[in-house]
A protein has these predicted regions:
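A glycine/threonine-rich phosphate-anchoring loop and its flanking beta-alpha core
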Residues: 18, 118-181
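Catalytic nucleophile loop
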Residues: 113
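Acidic-aromatic/histidine active-site loop/patch
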Residues: 110
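Short, well-ordered alpha-helices that flank and scaffold nucleotide-derived cofactor binding pockets
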Residues: 91, 95, 117-122
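Hydrophobic "anchor" residues on beta-strands that sit immediately upstream
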Residues: 48, 103-104, 129, 167
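ATP/NTP phosphate-donor binding region
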Residues: 2-103
């Protein structure tokens, strides 16, 4: 068997996405939580965190800095992906006096992305948000394109819109526990 090869640089650290709401970059970062914390030196912005409760628990030490900011952990299951959850995030943003110079970090899989992106897009007609996908599907599919939808009246993604993130941060450690194929 002959192996075909090509000159492909597999050491890419970013991909540009030309999305219709707005272009954005997907960055590949090891130790993403440390990267986020170091990037918070920009005093012209304020920060809010919306994180999957499982990720908050598994990475408790790495994410503890987030609790110094407005913070909400969430039980991310499909049955809770609804307008009430999005309004809970809007309440967090309102209580935080969030504005267009506030960055909402959404950390988790597709359920978190849908809820957080919807809240960010509709709160005060839109604030910037950054997505940190922690599932294989989140890292390979849902982080590209900006689709977001909430379930309503037993219908999946009935209430939907496009809301591209300002940035996507992918850390391969989140999928390192997957079984070998």
């Amino acid at each position: 068997n002959e192996v075909l090869s090509a000159n492909i640089d597999l050491n890419i650290d970013r991909i540009s996405v030309n999305s219709s709401p707005r272009p954005y970059e997907v960055l590949f970062k090891d130790n993403v939580f440390s990267f986020i914390e170091k990037g918070m030196d920009h005093k012209e912005f304020s920060y809010v965190f919306f994180i999957d409760e499982n990720i908050a628990s598994l990475y408790e030490e790495e994410t503890k800095f987030m609790k110094n900011y407005p913070y909400k952990s969430f039980h991310a299951i499909e049955e809770l992906k609804n307008v009430d959850a999005a309004f809970d995030v809007c309440d967090l943003l309102l209580e935080s006096n969030a504005n267009r110079k506030t960055i909402l970090y959404v950390i988790g899989g597709g359920v978190m992305q849908d809820i957080g992106a919807y809240a960010a897009a509709t709160y005060k007609r839109g604030i910037p948000w950054v997505y940190v996908p922690t599932t294989l599907l989140g890292q390979s599919d849902s982080c590209v394109g900006g689709k977001t939808g909430l379930n309503y009246k037993h219908t999946k993604n009935l209430i939907a819109l496009f809301s591209a993130p300002r940035q996507v941060l992918i850390d391969p450690k989140f999928i390192s526990t997957l079984n070998s194929v």
